[in-house]
């Protein structure tokens, strides 16, 4: 059985690292959206799960509890979609070498 070439393995690891940096830059530009209450609350989140925008219909501002619930629902929806998109992009680059969930845990650090 032939041993893998350590130099080739190191080169592959370096290439994968460079690709991952490119993916993270791309994810910062990728925007997903979430909404709640039939569009009364809308949010945008980037692929690194940073909240970019929040829009609240002025007609619902008098009901503070409802606004809070809708904001939470919209943000969670956008973050879930962002996480799905991020995992897909990371999986394309990782090709089974790296667990995307482990990378996502460290993205916010």
Swiss-Prot record:
**GO CC list:** bacterial nucleoid; cytosol
Q: What is its main location?
A: cytoplasm
Record GO terms (molecular function): DNA binding
Per its UniProt record, what InterPro entries does this chain match?
A: YbaB-like_sf, YbaB/EbfC
- A Pfam family that this protein carries is YbaB_DNA_bd
The subcellular localization recorded is: Cytoplasm, Nucleoid
Which cysteine pairs make disulfide bonds?
none
What does this protein's UniProt record list under function? Binds to DNA and alters its conformation. May be involved in regulation of gene expression, nucleoid organization and DNA protection.
Belongs to which family?
Belongs to the YbaB/EbfC family.
| NCBIfam families, sorted | DNA_YbaB_EbfC
Q: What is this protein called?
A: Nucleoid-associated protein Cvib_1034
* Species of the source: Chlorobium phaeovibrioides (strain DSM 265 / 1930)
Q: What is the lineage of its organism?
A: Bacteria, Pseudomonadati, Chlorobiota, Chlorobiia, Chlorobiales
């Amino acid at each position: 059985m032939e041993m893998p070439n350590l130099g080739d393995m190191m080169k592959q690891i370096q290439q994968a690292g460079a690709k991952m940096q490119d993916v993270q830059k791309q994810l910062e530009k990728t925007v997903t959206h979430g909404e709640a209450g039939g569009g009364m609350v809308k949010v945008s989140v980037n692929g690194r799960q940073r909240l970019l925008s929040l829009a609240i219909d002025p007609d619902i501002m008098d009901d503070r509890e409802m606004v809070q619930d809708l904001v939470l629902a919209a943000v969670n929806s956008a973050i879930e979609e962002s996480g799905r998109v991020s995992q897909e992009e990371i999986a394309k680059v990782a090709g089974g070498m790296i667990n995307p969930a482990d990378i996502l845990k460290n993205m916010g650090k």
